[in-house]
């Protein structure tokens, strides 16, 4: 279509439009994500766009003064209008300048607008009837298009803006359609914009106005950040100070605002709720429509409105800004109205509120990190140790930080990590420089200069101002002297204290100076630079919200502080490291202490009873000064006076309240709790530093002046201090009860955790001599338990665990000094006579109590990392499957928590044993010190001090050759105290003894039981586990000594009859051989440590003797030893037994032997079942043998029984002589389980001996350094004390054992009596009675019962034959012994009586076990389906049988079998059965 009025210009405009379209297509290809341009009106007059009346109004209406009327009506109007059309003349002069200016600009970016910013389709100008339709949006301006536009405007000015014909509607229908479309679009857009109006984001840009309306004033009046008309950013006077946000940020802010308006931002709501509860309303808020209108009305046209999006981090430690990377943050929208400075103030208030909310939880983490780093940093030799231990923590925390970051910002966080590290290190270094600059080596000059209150106040003011002015980044911090209003009160109390003691002035001033320096140090670590709102590239970065767990955030913060402190301390000069020592002393004197008494009242001196009320008041004051959840934390953001009061009150709580004269030498136990640690250890620290004690005593006395003396009440300072403390006590008194309960619960768990570690280390310290043998046994044990497929993975896991524990040992042992200095200090303190000198000697010890606590904490932390390796390995199927049936050994393991924890303990047990076995002798001595440290921390007090003669390690009572060292010169009082401490720990009450019997009756593999928390119950369980093993060993020693091998072979044959599978029998034989080798190794190990008798009689100086000398001496003294063992209850042989092989040595050797054999019980007798090569064509008859828990235990005992017999039978004659000595050890040390084998009269004595052996074994296990001779002498007195209690306990045990076996014994006695009666009755009457008894049970088939009766009779016959033969052989042996030893009739009679009782007990136990196997005999036979099923319906008879009926059926089965066996016995055997009945009558209550 041609234009009759402007033909040339129309062609040019059309060409320019086509060129714009092509350029637009190219730009869309270049951009990955095209941004929609806002639709602005163009100047092309195409279509019926304008009317004649509207065009003059457009160019004449855009003035700066008509802004008020238009802006109130529309939200997206431009604010530049002109009053009259006179200014249009100036357009011609301004346009060339603007064109040149645009040509110079290299890049003109496009405006990306949201749908929210799309213009309204219609707008009213001066009236409602006049409509103006917006044209398409302006495309990218070029030089050609701008020239064409200028020409158009000039032509319009010349022709008076005549209306072209194409602007007029052709028909009424066209005009109606245009009006309808305009109304619909306007209504839709008004609905969309109505709820999304915002004063700062919905403003129109300069391109909203007509492009030709720009004038001279337009550049000055334009208030928009970016103007498409001018093609550049506007920089006004107000914007010079703060950078202008870019277009990209402006667009992103509008998009974010849209999303938040549609759905209310949950994060802002949550932040507002949490902050409003604690710290008042939130600074940032969301602007509503009403508020935006009010802001629009108040705008004057200046470029002062700015919208900033500020991210306020709320980190836990409130420290550096860069530390907030990887943490959760909250975004707060702040509207800055008229002034940039006002916006800065608003942002500072919001940030300060969020920061102050988190400063309360800073203290514990910061105190702990600084204390640990300073303690490790000032030691020159610890650099390597810190390097090794810190690498693991850095790696772990780096992983935590990386996992915490979102997937979108990982690259950005990775770039900033190094920057964060460097800035944190610089901050900490500045803090160290400031604090170390004020620490002098000689505190005397500083102390003398400050002697008055005025000097104190002036000095503190200068120091505080200097500390604040030294750092420019922390200018917003207030001076310390203004905040510490109560500092003069403390100074006055110190000055008043000088009246009572003038010699303490310098120490008090140094103490107060330490408080101030540490306070400044913490503040300098906690300072925060002011955030710059917009700075170059950082202003364009959009901060995003991240979500992170609290635990990960805490680890990241601790790692950041740890890393910075380690880097700073490593780079310090030697002179500065000396100053760090002073800082460490300050931490030791000011570290937060918990003085609550939880079971440590025995350590407090008797003088404290007078001041219990004062202690209780101060305790409440200390706990009320803090929050209920975190009382022990010292927050750096709090006042200095509050910190001083807390530290002084905490130290005062732990000091014995004595008189003023005794305050100088106070030795107080304090408790240091670490709330942040994962292990939560309870550690008792005896404060032995004299300077620390004096300082704390002075501070405590300064706090309690108003409570002690009447003269102190006159001072106003003390009154104000007491009032201040009383107010705090009343306000925070409600939180005390809940906190005490939480602390008590934590204390129990902490002590339990530490006791487990102490027990593990002590266990391996005692058993480290035979570590190589244990290593082989554990390897065999893992092979049997896990199988051959898993051994490679288990070896790798074990190697990793051993390596980590070795690193832990190297770390902890490198910091433990040699014991020579400790021994010298102990000897010096023992020679001193006065108590003050003793305390001073203790404080001079290099390895003080606080260092022990720190080392133990590190050691436990390093050991906890060992639990990470998982010993399990994926089971992969073989690559080539065999044609044979696969032998799959399935090992079912429960998933309960107890099983997992026990598996971890087993892994730690193995790793500790391996690590201790590889230590050098010097390091083993240091491990002894570590064990002593565990004892001190757990028990709360040191063991009695040893003299030079008795200062050997804990394990010197047994050496590699098994020779205890005789120690002389020990004081009687100290020895008695030591014995009391040993037996006071392991006294077992009556309830624990009952629990011991229950444990004895439980199955051996009780892995699913819950973990035992009580330490005494754990001891009882260990005794119960060992009791069955002691019984088996004793049984085989007795049988070997008496030569009863034939009976054992028959009993084993009876047990072997249960295994009816031939393939299983072959593999059981293979298992036996392995078990025999293990038992033989255990025997060789224990026999090699049994010394010769003659060497014990002469002296114990020689450590190594040859085997030949042992054989000769044993052969010479064998008869003498037998006489000694036979007459153990006579006082004639007690002296000889004292000189020789004492009871303590026997207990240790037997305990080791039991522990060696204890690993064999885990061997499972089950074997993989192999399918046959050729399956039988007939129907397979499968016999399922249900094995109960008792049966499983019996099978294990049978396996050990067989292995012990085979091992003893293959011993050499010389070793069999040693076996006789071992059997005599069993005679002298009677066991708990053998009490039932004695007569009722001798039950109490045997119980006493068993109790004596158990207590002595535990004492030797945990207190190896105790003198063997002293313990043996004290055991006699203990035996006399336990006789009365043992009688009652023995009766209860006898009743329980008799109840267990009463049913079987009653059946046997009944059968013996029936046998005697049946001999007199005729055979006919007996047959009738048997038939009647058989008819009673109608549910059992006759044919099947005959088969089972014969099998049961054969089993019982074999058992009785074996027992009868044993009894006859025993009688023959006893007769021979009585004939040979006719001269010693008394000794032989006692021996015969004792052995007869013991043999009866053994034989009866075996017989009862055999009968229990008969009871397990299942009379039911598997029911097979017929090969040809019948057509009729199957008739199934269900027989419901109760538990009592089932029990009666079992008893009837045994009764019937006994009747059959007894009736068929020969007269000779019936006589032997009578002896068996007599044995039952002597041991059973039913016989009486």
Swiss-Prot record:
Biased composition (Basic and acidic residues): 76-86, 833-844, 954-971, 1316-1328
Biased composition (Acidic residues): 297-312
PANTHER family: CALMODULIN BINDING PROTEIN PICBP (PTHR33923:SF3), CALMODULIN-BINDING PROTEIN-RELATED (PTHR33923)
Renumbered residue ranges of the record's region Calmodulin-binding: 493-592, 831-938, 1135-1229, 1379-1483
Residue numbers spanned by region Disordered: 1-31, 63-112, 280-329, 378-414, 816-844, 941-971, 1232-1252, 1316-1340
Name listed for the protein in its UniProt record: Calmodulin binding protein PICBP
Organism placement in taxonomy: Eukaryota, Viridiplantae, Streptophyta, Embryophyta, Tracheophyta
Keywords: Calmodulin-binding, Plant defense
Function description: Binds calmodulin in a calcium-dependent manner in vitro. May play a role in general plant defense including R gene-mediated responses.
Organism for this UniProt entry: Arabidopsis thaliana
Biased composition (Low complexity): 1235-1252
Single GO BP term: defense response
Any one GO molecular function term: calmodulin binding
Gene that encodes it: PICBP
Biased composition (Basic residues): 18-31, 98-107
Family annotation (InterPro entries): CaM-bd_dom_pln, PICBP-like
Induction and repression of expression: Induced by infection with the bacterial pathogen Pseudomonas syringae pv tomato strain DC3000 carrying the avirulent factor avrRpm1.
């Amino acid at each position: 279509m041609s234009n009759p009025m402007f033909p040339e210009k129309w062609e040019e405009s059309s060409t320019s439009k086509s060129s714009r379209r092509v350029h637009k297509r190219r730009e869309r290809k270049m951009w990955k994500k095209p941004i929609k341009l806002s639709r602005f009106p163009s100047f092309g007059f195409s279509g019926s766009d304008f009317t004649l009346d509207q065009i003059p109004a457009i160019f004449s209406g855009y003035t700066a003064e008509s802004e008020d009327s238009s802006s109130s009506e529309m939200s997206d109007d431009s604010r530049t209008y002109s009053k009259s059309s006179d200014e249009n003349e100036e357009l011609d002069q301004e346009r060339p300048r603007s064109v040149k200016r645009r040509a110079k600009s290299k890049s003109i970016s496009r405006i990306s607008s949201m749908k929210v910013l799309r213009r309204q389709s219609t707008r009213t100008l001066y009236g409602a009837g006049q409509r103006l339709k917006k044209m398409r949006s302006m495309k990218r301006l070029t030089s050609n298009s701008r020239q064409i536009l200028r020409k158009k405007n000039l032509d319009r000015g010349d022709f008076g803006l005549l209306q072209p014909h194409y602007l007029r509607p052709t028909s009424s229908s066209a005009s109606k359609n245009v009006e309808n479309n305009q109304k619909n679009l306007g209504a839709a857009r008004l609905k969309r914009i109505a709820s999304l109006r915002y004063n700062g984001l919905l403003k129109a840009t300069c391109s909203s106005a007509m492009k030709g309306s720009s004038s001279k004033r337009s550049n000055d009046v334009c208030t928009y950040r970016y103007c498409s008309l001018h093609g550049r950013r506007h920089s006004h006077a107000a914007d010079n100070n703060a950078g202008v946000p870019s277009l990209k940020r402006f667009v992103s802010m509008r998009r974010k605002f849209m999303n938040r308006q549609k759905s209310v931002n949950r994060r802002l709501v949550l932040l507002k709720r949490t902050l409003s509860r604690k710290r008042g309303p939130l600074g940032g808020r969301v602007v509503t429509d009403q508020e935006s209108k009010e802001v629009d009305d108040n705008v004057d046209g200046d470029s002062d409105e700015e919208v900033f999006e500020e991210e306020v981090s709320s980190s836990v430690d409130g420290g550096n800004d860069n530390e907030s990377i990887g943490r959760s943050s909250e975004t707060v929208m702040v509207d800055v109205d008229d002034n940039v400075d006002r916006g800065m103030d608003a942002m500072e208030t919001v940030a300060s509120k969020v920061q102050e909310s988190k400063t309360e939880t800073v203290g514990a983490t910061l105190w702990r990190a600084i204390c640990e780093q300073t303690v490790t940093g000032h030691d020159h030799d610890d650099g390597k140790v810190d390097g090794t231990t810190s690498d693991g923590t850095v790696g772990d925390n780096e992983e935590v930080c990386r996992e915490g970051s979102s997937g979108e910002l990982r690259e950005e966080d990775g770039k900033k990590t190094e920057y964060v590290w460097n800035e944190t290190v610089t901050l900490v270094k500045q803090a160290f420089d400031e604090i170390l600059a004020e620490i002098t080596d000689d505190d005397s000059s500083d102390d003398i200069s400050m002697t008055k209150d005025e000097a104190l106040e002036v000095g503190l003011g200068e120091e505080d101002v200097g500390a604040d002015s030294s750092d420019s980044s922390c200018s917003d911090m207030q001076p310390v002297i203004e905040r510490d209003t109560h500092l003069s009160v403390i100074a006055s109390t110190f000055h008043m204290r000088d009246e009572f003691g003038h010699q303490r002035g310098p120490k008090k001033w140094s103490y107060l100076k330490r408080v101030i320096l540490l306070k400044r140090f913490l503040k300098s670590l906690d300072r925060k630079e002011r955030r710059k709102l917009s700075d170059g590239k950082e202003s364009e970065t959009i901060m995003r919200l991240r979500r992170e767990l609290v635990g990960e955030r805490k680890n990241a913060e601790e790692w950041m502080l740890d890393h910075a402190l380690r880097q700073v301390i490593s780079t310090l000069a030697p002179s500065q490291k000396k100053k760090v020592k002073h800082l460490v002393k300050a931490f030791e004197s000011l570290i937060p202490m918990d003085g609550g008494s939880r079971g440590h009242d025995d350590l407090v001196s008797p003088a404290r009873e007078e001041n219990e009320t004062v202690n209780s008041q101060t305790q409440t004051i200390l706990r009320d000064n803090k929050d209920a959840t975190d009382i022990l934390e010292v927050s750096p953001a709090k006042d200095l006076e509050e910190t001083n009061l807390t530290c002084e009150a905490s130290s005062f709580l732990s000091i014995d309240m004595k008189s003023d004269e005794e305050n100088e030498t106070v030795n107080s136990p304090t408790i240091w709790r670490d709330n942040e640690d994962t292990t939560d250890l309870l550690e008792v620290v005896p404060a032995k530093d004299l300077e620390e004690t004096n300082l704390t005593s002075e501070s405590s006395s300064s706090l309690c002046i108003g409570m002690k003396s009447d003269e102190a009440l006159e001072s106003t300072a003390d009154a104000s201090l007491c009032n201040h403390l009383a107010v705090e006590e009343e306000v925070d008194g409600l939180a005390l009860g809940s906190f005490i309960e939480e602390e008590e619960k934590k204390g129990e768990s902490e002590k339990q955790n530490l006791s487990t570690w102490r027990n593990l280390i002590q266990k391996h310290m005692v058993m480290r001599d035979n570590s190589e043998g244990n290593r082989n046994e554990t390897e065999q044990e893992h092979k049997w338990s896990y199988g051959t497929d898993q051994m490679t993975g288990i070896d790798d896991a074990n190697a990793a665990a051993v390596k980590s524990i070795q690193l832990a040992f190297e770390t902890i042992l490198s910091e433990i000094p040699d014991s020579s200095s400790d021994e010298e200090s102990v000897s010096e303190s023992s020679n001193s006579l006065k108590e003050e000198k003793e305390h001073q000697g203790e404080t001079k010890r290099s390895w003080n109590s606080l260092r022990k606590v720190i080392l133990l904490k590190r050691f436990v932390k390093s050991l906890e990392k060992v639990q990470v390796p998982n010993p399990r390995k994926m089971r992969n199927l073989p690559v080539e499957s065999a044609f044979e049936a696969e032998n799959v050994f399935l090992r079912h393991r429960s998933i309960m928590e107890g099983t997992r924890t026990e598996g971890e303990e087993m892994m730690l047990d193995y790793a500790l044993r391996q690590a201790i076995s590889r230590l050098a002798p010097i390091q083993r001595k240091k491990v002894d010190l570590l064990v002593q440290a565990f004892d001190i921390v757990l028990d709360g007090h040191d063991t009695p001090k040893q003299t030079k003669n008795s200062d050997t390690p804990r394990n010197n009572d047994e050496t590699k050759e098994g020779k205890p060292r005789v120690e002389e010169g020990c004081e009687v009082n100290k020895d008695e105290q030591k014995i009391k401490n040993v037996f006071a720990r392991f006294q077992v009450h009556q309830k624990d003894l009952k629990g011991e019997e229950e444990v004895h009756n439980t199955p051996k593999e009780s892995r699913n039981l819950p973990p035992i928390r009580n330490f005494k119950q754990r001891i009882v369980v260990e005794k119960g586990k060992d009791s069955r093993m002691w019984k088996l060993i004793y049984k085989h020693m007795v049988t070997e000594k008496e030569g009863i091998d034939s009976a054992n072979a028959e009993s084993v044959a009876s047990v072997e009859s249960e295994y009816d599978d031939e393939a299983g029998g072959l593999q059981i034989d293979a298992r036996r051989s392995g078990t025999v080798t293990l038992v033989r190794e255990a025997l060789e190990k224990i026999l090699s440590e049994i010394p010769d008798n003659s060497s014990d009689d002469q002296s114990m100086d020689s450590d190594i003797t040859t085997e030949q000398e042992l054989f000769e001496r044993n052969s010479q003294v064998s008869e003498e030893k037998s006489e000694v063992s036979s007459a153990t209850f006579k006082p004639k042989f007690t002296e000889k037994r004292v000189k020789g092989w004492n009871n303590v040595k026997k207990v240790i050797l037997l305990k080791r032997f039991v522990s060696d054999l204890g690993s064999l019980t885990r061997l499972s007798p089950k074997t993989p079942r192999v399918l046959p090569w050729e399956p039988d064509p007939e129907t397979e008859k499968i016999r399922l043998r249900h094995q109960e828990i008792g049966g499983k235990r019996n099978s294990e005992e049978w396996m050990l029984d067989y292995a012990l017999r085979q091992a003893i039978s293959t011993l050499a004659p010389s070793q069999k002589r040693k076996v006789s000595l071992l059997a005599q050890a069993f005679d002298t040390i009677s066991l708990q389980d053998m009490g039932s084998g004695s007569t009722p009269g001798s039950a109490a004595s045997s119980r006493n001996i068993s109790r004596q052996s158990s207590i002595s074994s535990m004492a030797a296990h945990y207190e190896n350094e105790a003198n063997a001779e002293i313990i043996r002498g004290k055991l006699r007195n203990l035996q006399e004390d336990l006789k009365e209690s043992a009688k009652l306990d023995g009766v209860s045990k006898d009743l329980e054992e008799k109840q267990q076996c009463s049913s079987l014994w009653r059946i046997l006695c009944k059968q013996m009596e029936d046998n005697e009666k049946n001999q007199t009755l005729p055979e006919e009457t007996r047959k009738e009675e048997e038939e009647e008894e058989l008819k009673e049970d109608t549910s059992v088939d006759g044919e099947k019962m005959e088969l089972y009766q014969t099998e049961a009779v054969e089993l019982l016959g074999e058992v009785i034959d074996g027992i009868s033969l044993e009894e006859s052989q025993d009688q023959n042996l006893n007769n021979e012994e009585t004939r040979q030893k006719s001269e010693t009739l008394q000794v032989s009679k006692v021996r015969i009586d004792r052995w007869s009782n013991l043999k009866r007990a053994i034989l009866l136990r075996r017989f009862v076990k055999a009968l229990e196997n008969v009871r397990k005999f299942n009379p039911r036979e598997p029911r097979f389906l017929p090969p040809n099923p019948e057509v009729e319906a199957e008739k199934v008879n269900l027989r419901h049988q109760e538990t009592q009926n089932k029990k009666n059926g079992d008893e009837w089965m045994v009764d019937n079998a006994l009747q059959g066996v007894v009736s068929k016995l020969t007269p000779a055997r019936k006589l032997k059965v009578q002896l068996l009945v007599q044995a039952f009558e002597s041991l059973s209550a039913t016989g009486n």
